[in-house]
UniProtKB/Swiss-Prot annotation:
Gene3D superfamilies named in the record: DNA-binding pseudobarrel domain (2.40.330.10)
Protein name: B3 domain-containing protein At5g06250
InterPro entries hit by this protein: B3_DNA-bd, DNA-bd_pseudobarrel_sf, LEC2-like
A Pfam family this chain is assigned to: B3
Source organism of this protein record: Arabidopsis thaliana
Keywords noted in UniProt: DNA-binding, Nucleus, Transcription, Transcription regulation
TM ranges: none
PANTHER family: B3 DOMAIN-CONTAINING TRANSCRIPTION FACTOR ABI3, TF-B3 DOMAIN-CONTAINING PROTEIN
GO terms, molecular function: DNA binding; DNA-binding transcription factor activity
Amino acid sequence: MSVNHYSTDHHHTLLWQQQQHRHTTDTSETTTTATWLHDDLKESLFEKSLTPSDVGKLNRLVIPKQHAEKYFPLNAVLVSSAAADTSSSEKGMLLSFEDESGKSWRFRYSYWNSSQSYVLTKGWSRFVKDKQLDPGDVVFFQRHRSDSRRLFIGWRRRGQGSSSSVAATNSAVNTSSMGALSYHQIHATSNYSNPPSHSEYSHYGAAVATAAETHSTPSSSVVGSSRTVRLFGVNLECQMDENDGDDSVAVATTVESPDGYYGQNMYYYYSHPHNMVILTLL
């Protein structure tokens, strides 16, 4: 008779693996939390859509003057003093930024008297190549809320706008579609002597059928060839002519009219079996 002994080494191995898994999970959660807090501590400064010259061979990014003077002010002597040396103002200073991965980027920031513009020069072309930036892409700048010396730089592709604008566009499209559907669900006319031909509305069959399923509740009472349908709070009796070869049958029903629809006929069509219901509003 053989006895299998539980290996002590195996027990220690399992215990070590469990501890490692717990440590990895805790580290991942801590990193995620730290990243979230880090992003929350960033203050957005400004952004700029890149021009062809910004990503071209000129090796420079033009910073809009209002943003440059507000967030990256150079020494006032270098910019505004009449006695300032042009070479000193164009030499400028070095600015350090962190990208989304934490990598540090250093750019020379200066003021060009010739074009009267603030620019990032040395080091900019490396950033363009590393991120593979193209004209129309957007770069944005941020600053740490509690440590103003920490600056951040980020970027996004052209056309990647905010979700709110996309949601607003989708909402407008949906509203427009519902308006068009409502118009074709019910067609009201004043004192028609003859109802419109079925072919005039046949291409609206699918939309109207959907509306009928949504807004009407069919009754379980079906006697012979008649069918009772409740539509918009009104019980309608649809007479089906079984001997008629034409699948388009018009049925007239007199109901109490809402305000503003006195003496009007309302025509309602189904896609299958292509019946038309005429509501005479009193």
